[in-house]
Curated annotation (Swiss-Prot):
Organism: Caretta caretta (Loggerhead sea turtle)
Domain of life the protein comes from: Eukaryota
Record PTM: Glycosylated.
Keyword flag Secreted: yes
Presence of the UniProt keyword Secreted in the record: yes
Function of the molecule: Rathke gland secretions may function as pheromones, as predator repellents, or contribute to the maintenance of the turtle shell.
Compartmental location: Secreted
GO cellular component: extracellular region
Transmembrane segments: none
The protein, known as: Rathke gland glycoprotein
Keyword set, alphabetical order: Glycoprotein, Secreted
């Protein structure tokens, strides 16, 4: 999420 490369189910930045 949020500018990192983690897979999180949010409407943040690049997953």
């Amino acid at each position: 999420s949020d500018d990192d490369g983690t897979v999180v189910l949010t409407t943040s930045g690049p997953i």
